Amino acid sequence: MEITIEMIKELRERTGAGVMEAKKALEEANGDMEKAVTILREKGVIKAAKKAGRVAKEGIIEAYIHTGDKLGVLVEINCETDFVARTDEFRKLAKDIALQIAGMNPQYVSKEDVPPEVIEKEKEIYRTQLRNEGKPEHVIEKIIEGKLEKFYEEVCLLEQPFVRNPEIKVKDLITEAISKLGENIVVRRFARFVVGEE
């Protein structure tokens, strides 16, 4: 199938890819637009993985105050250069993440931030529940792993389904931004405040 300029333009608008990347993806997908998007996303993940090791020491602190002034969020998001930190794309990402924190109330940034004693406590609760349900011992550990993944989705910001598009997780949203902006991006820390809460 012949790849037209219009097809390349459409794919670039949808993905933010360069001209040659878009053309190669369309050729690889035999002109199938959805398949080409998938190919570019996969390549974007590879690019993002390469950038993950780079130091991100620039960035911004985004503040969000919910209507009624009863709930507020501060989040620090870092990138590699102040140029990227000033872009609309980066600021939109920071705002989306602040809204995510306000709405979903995560406790930690990532799985690695969850203290081992919290994980052990959760495992023990699940183990007791499963034994009380009469589950065989040989399947309990497998079930616990599945339950832990659900637990991470509730308490870890990066593992949560993104509120504006639950098809993807917050970490996927950041990976897409890394791919588009060409720099490593890290959610460093956040604080969520609710009036009257300790």
UniProtKB/Swiss-Prot annotation:
Annotated keywords: Cytoplasm, Elongation factor, Protein biosynthesis
Gene Ontology BP term (one): translational elongation
GO MF terms held by the record: translation elongation factor activity
Coarse class of the protein's main subcellular location: cytoplasm
Pfam families: EF_TS
GO cellular component, as recorded: cytoplasm
InterPro entries with a match to the protein in the record: EF-Ts_dimer_sf, Transl_elong_EFTs/EF1B, Transl_elong_EFTs/EF1B_dimer, Transl_elong_Ts_CS, UBA-like_sf
Region (Involved in Mg(2+) ion dislocation from EF-Tu): 81-84
Gene3D superfamilies from the UniProt entry: 1.10.286.20, DNA helicase RuvA subunit, C-terminal domain, Elongation factor Ts, dimerisation domain
Disulfide topology: none
UniProt keyword Protein biosynthesis present: yes
Cellular compartments annotated: Cytoplasm
Purpose: Associates with the EF-Tu.GDP complex and induces the exchange of GDP to GTP. It remains bound to the aminoacyl-tRNA.EF-Tu.GTP complex up to the GTP hydrolysis stage on the ribosome.
Family, per entry: Belongs to the EF-Ts family.
Protein name: Elongation factor Ts
Lineage: Bacteria, Pseudomonadati, Dictyoglomota, Dictyoglomia, Dictyoglomales
Chain's gene name: tsf
